[in-house]
């Protein structure tokens, strides 16, 4: 009987060794340098190892994984119901039943004996060492007992893998007088110089591939790409940096395997995406860029309930295989659709000429060919999105992605629950940290700040959803605009808000100038979420409304400055507000009233006159509006309507 004809019951009887391959310290590997080309190359290299080299090795041992075929057939199906109807059949056609999943730097599969498992683990570790130096991979296997359930084995192997990771990894000491450090990372020994470039590259065997060696064109392209990076300042680089440059170049020129998110987005945009951008290309206004880091919520609780819903091993194994594909598809599909929609609306306004061998590529008329500056997709897969966007699109992209991802995962859970007597009460959402920072901010600092904001958003989700038992959860988003100090302590900075605006209730989080973190599905229109925080959509719409009316942000600053002035009484602030309003146009006053309902609030009160209790509740998100005012684009359709109404 062929492997395809076997049932999951057969697979579990014959294969009692579970294997886990896990790439660890991924963020350290990707963000070891601040050069965008190397970060891009590191990300693509990890995708290449996970989607090409690991399946290649598994195929040698009879385990087939046709990821390219799977993606082409079902990742672009628009209708969720159709996708979910076809996913089981397509997975069984393209993925060996012994493979639980391969993706997001990890792999989990079953084999018949421990010797085979150890051979595979050894070979995978060796290919990582050869092709992705400094990448950290843990490969472990677990022999299941005769009557041990697959979910128990998964938990046991996870514990074994965690123990292995806790042992750490050997570190090379390069802090020695004679050691020459890599000029790009500063953390590895330099082994490649401009003077001896070709010899040095040959010595580190950079032209090797998993199945042999690169062809002459690939060798030439690699040498040229590395030369272009190091020749300007005659720098010396490490093997790791050289490999990252190689794979950054490979992603642009030689993506024959069509792996990773770039292969999806460039097709969606009809190849109008610049693949060799610099960080400055994403700058908006006073050199600000947007950094987005989103991560799935509730996966742990969701998967705990899977064991209660799918009580047989066969059902459980089948579901887990499907779940990993659906999670990855929804992440990539939604991000693609969000970007495509914004692209079609003309929101990506910047274009950049294409270079080849240092020269501009020309069209038939002799003019430079330009492509759109869209984004740098550093991590997209599983439930993670880590990307750089133009600063005036980052918050809106994140919101739209989180909202649509949440809707897709909710739909999936509903359809699964309809099939089963026992229901999974959890739903998977996404929480995100968005950093708006200067383009000179080191990338690792952007990542660290994004992670802190993401954790803040997740904490708010936990806090607000813990009392929503049996109700649909929603994700959250936190954001921060950072000036020249990329390493600012956001938590300490925000304490000033508590101390300044809410001395009596500082532990309750009522800031009265900010409502961060915001929910994705808020309480404004949806009764299902009436007990959660205000949504980020409301804030975005407020800013767009102000910008459509050409409301000056200097007047928003006046209101904010008045809010933070604790030398004035409540009545004095109201009087000064009236004075500020008297200098505004009727249209400006109308928009303030529409957004904050000031008409019925600007009343003097002579009770407790010396206590600033009333005014602090006015404009309770004014700092959020002020901070992102320059980082939300005005909708073109709204602008055109305003122009038509004004007779322009």
Task: Please give the residue ranges for each predicted region.
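Regulatory and interdomain segments flanking nucleotide-handling catalytic cores
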Residues: 1-648
């Amino acid at each position: 009987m062929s492997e395809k004809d076997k049932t999951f019951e057969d697979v579990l009887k014959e294969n009692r060794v579970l294997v886990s391959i896990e790439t660890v310290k991924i963020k350290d590997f990707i963000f070891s340098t601040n050069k965008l080309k190397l970060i891009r190359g590191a990300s693509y290299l990890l995708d290449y190892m996970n989607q090409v080299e690991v399946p290649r090795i598994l195929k040698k041992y009879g385990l087939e994984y046709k990821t390219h075929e799977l993606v082409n057939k079902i990742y672009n199906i628009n209708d969720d119901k159709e996708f979910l109807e076809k996913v089981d059949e397509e997975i069984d056609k393209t993925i060996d039943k012994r493979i639980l999943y391969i993706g997001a730097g990890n792999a989990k599969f079953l084999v018949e004996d421990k010797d085979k498992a150890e051979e595979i683990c050894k070979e995978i570790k060796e290919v990582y060492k050869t092709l992705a130096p400094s990448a950290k991979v843990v490969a472990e296997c677990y022999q299941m007992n005769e009557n041990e359930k697959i979910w128990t084995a998964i938990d046991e192997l996870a514990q074994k893998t965690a123990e292995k990771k806790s042992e750490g990894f050997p570190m090379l000491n390069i802090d020695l007088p004679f050691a020459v450090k890599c000029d790009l990372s500063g953390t590895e020994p330099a082994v490649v110089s401009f003077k001896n470039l070709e010899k040095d590259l040959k010595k580190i065997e950079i032209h090797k591939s998993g199945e042999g060696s690169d062809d002459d064109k690939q060798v030439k392209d690699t040498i040229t790409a590395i030369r272009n990076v190091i020749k300007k300042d005659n720098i010396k680089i490490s093997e790791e940096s050289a490999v990252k440059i190689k794979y950054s170049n490979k992603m642009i020129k030689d993506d024959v395997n069509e792996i990773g998110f770039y292969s999806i987005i460039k097709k969606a945009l009809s190849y109008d995406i610049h693949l060799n951008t610099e960080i400055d290309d994403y700058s908006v206004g006073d050199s600000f860029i947007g950094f987005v880091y989103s991560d799935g919520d509730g996966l742990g609780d969701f998967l705990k309930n899977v064991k209660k819903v799918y009580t047989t091993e066969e059902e459980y194994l089948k579901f887990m295989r499907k779940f990993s594909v659906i999670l990855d598809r929804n992440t990539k599909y939604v991000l693609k659709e969000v970007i495509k929609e914004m692209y079609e609306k003309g929101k990506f306004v910047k274009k950049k000429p294409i270079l080849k061998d240092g020269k501009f590529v020309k069209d038939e008329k002799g003019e430079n060919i330009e492509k759109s500056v869209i984004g740098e997709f550093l991590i997209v897969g599983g439930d993670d999105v880590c990307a750089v966007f133009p600063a005036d699109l980052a918050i809106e992209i994140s919101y739209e992605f989180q909202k649509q991802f949440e809707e897709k995962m909710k739909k999936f859970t509903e359809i699964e629950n309809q099939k089963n007597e026992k229901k999974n009460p959890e739903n998977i959402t996404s929480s995100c940290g968005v950093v708006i920072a200067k383009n000179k901010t080191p990338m690792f600092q952007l990542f660290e700040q994004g992670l802190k904001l993401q954790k803040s958003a997740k904490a708010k989700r936990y806090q607000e959803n813990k009392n929503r038992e049996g109700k649909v959860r929603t994700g959250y988003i936190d954001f921060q605009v950072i000036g020249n100090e990329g390493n600012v302590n956001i938590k300490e900075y925000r304490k000033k808000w508590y101390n300044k605006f809410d001395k009596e209730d500082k532990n309750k989080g009522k800031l009265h100038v900010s409502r961060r973190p915001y929910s994705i599905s808020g309480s404004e229109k949806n009764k299902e979420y009436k007990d959660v925080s205000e949504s980020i959509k409301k804030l975005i719409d407020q800013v767009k409304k102000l910008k459509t009316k050409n409301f000056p942000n200097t007047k928003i600053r006046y209101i904010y400055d008045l809010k933070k002035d604790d030398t004035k009484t409540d009545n004095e602030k109201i009087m000064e507000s009236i004075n500020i309003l008297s200098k505004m146009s009727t249209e400006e006053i109308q928009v303030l009233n529409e957004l904050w309902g000031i008409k019925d609030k600007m009343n003097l009160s002579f009770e407790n006159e010396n206590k600033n209790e009333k005014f602090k509740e006015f404009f309770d998100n004014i700092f959020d509006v002020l901070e992102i005012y320059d980082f939300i684009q005005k909708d073109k359709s709204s602008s055109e309507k305003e122009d038509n109404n004004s007779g322009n």
